[in-house]
Amino acid sequence: MLTFPLINDTSRKIIHIDMDAFFASVEVRDNPSLKVKPVVIARNPLQTGGRGVVSTCSYEARAFGIHSASAKEAYDLCPQAIFISGNYEKYTKVSKQVREIFKRYTDDIEAASIDEAYLDVTENKIGAQSAIKIAKLIQHDIFVELGLTCSAGVSYNKFLAKIASDYEKPHGLTLIMPEEALEFLAKLPVEKFHGVGKATVPKLHALGFFNGGDLQKADPVDLAERFGVYGWELYQKANGIHNSKVKNYRERKSVGKERTYGKLLYLPDDIKAELSKISGKVSDSLKSHQLKGSIVILKLRYSDFTTLTKRKSLAEKLESPEEIAEVAQEIFEELEYDESLGVRLLGVTVTEFGAQKATLDMQ
């Protein structure tokens, strides 16, 4: 008989910091004439034939409905938007400056990306008992010294802290206490749960799960049977349980991204195009962590859940999206791909970082 022990550590004090519209905010800071204008970080689609994707955009641009989209879609929504190609080196430099501010308060820092990080301030450098106090100090320091705003979430685990940071933006600060977690999560739509993708939402809705309250009342064994380990993790999260520790860069051994498809992929060209997109996300993560790897791993899962995994070792370390995509596509071509089955999941991972200095941008 399966058993599911519910062990909940509520003793930690975790802060999640999310820089507000980071790339766009840096550009507006450095060019005040852009203030209160719709700024989109992407190459101008009129100059690229409609190619390119939006990295981020200002809140003024988001008011037009622009979020994660192609540059062409962004232009269609807001023709008056100001498109800026972006300067990754500049953003990385600012990210390091944010990191130095974090280090005033704790060394227990985990970079989730170039513009967000988790901090464990249970024990901290200023002897503060209040995580809220530290979050306010960090917000103050970032605003005064860097001219930028960030949103902060405070709770007893990473999952809740991240949800809290997204609750009130921009420049918000939200606290979720242990005794408030269940009620807070009960009202939260399932699509707001970190890790629930677009393909999973309709499946949950079809089963009658629309919010955290529905998941709290679910049978964990049934969820696990339907969704595997992820179903059990979802049940735990709905009950405020997420005991993953804040991990610094020394514990990072690989960087990877996966995507599950509600509509199966069949054509090799479509699969290669998706591998390019995933490789771009892996590259962003590698760059934000200042890492390069010499092994690329491709993961492919068919509609019948048969999973293929193949790796390729390289003489040189890589980090660019083009290089990663090229290797991932080469690995795919070497697989005995069965086009009749259809692909439900693709994943790309880069590992074998070696002895390089792995200093994280925000860590």
UniProtKB/Swiss-Prot annotation:
Cofactor note: Binds 2 magnesium ions per subunit.
A Pfam family hit: IMS_HHH
Function: Poorly processive, error-prone DNA polymerase involved in untargeted mutagenesis. Copies undamaged DNA at stalled replication forks, which arise in vivo from mismatched or misaligned primer ends. These misaligned primers can be extended by PolIV. Exhibits no 3'-5' exonuclease (proofreading) activity. May be involved in translesional synthesis, in conjunction with the beta clamp from PolIII.
Location of the UmuC domain: 14-197
Oligomeric and partner information: Monomer.
Binding site for Mg(2+): D18, D115
GO CC, any one term: cytosol
Family listed: Belongs to the DNA polymerase type-Y family.
Organism from which the protein derives: Lactococcus lactis subsp. lactis (strain IL1403)
Domain of life: Bacteria
Keyword Cytoplasm: yes
Cofactor(s) it depends on: Mg(2+)
Subcellular location: Cytoplasm
HAMAP family associated with the record: DNApol_IV (MF_01113)
EC number of this enzyme: 2.7.7.7
One MF term in the entry's GO annotations: magnesium ion binding
Keyword terms, alphabetized: Cytoplasm, DNA damage, DNA repair, DNA replication, DNA-binding, DNA-directed DNA polymerase, Magnesium, Metal-binding, Mutator protein, Nucleotidyltransferase, Transferase
Catalytic center residues: E116
Name this polypeptide is given: DNA polymerase IV
NCBIfam families: PRK02406.1
Catalytic activity: DNA(n) + a 2'-deoxyribonucleoside 5'-triphosphate = DNA(n+1) + diphosphate
PANTHER family in alphabetical order: DNA POLYMERASE KAPPA, DNA REPAIR POLYMERASE UMUC / TRANSFERASE FAMILY MEMBER
Statement: the UniProt record of this protein carries the keyword Magnesium: yes
Site positions (Substrate discrimination): F23
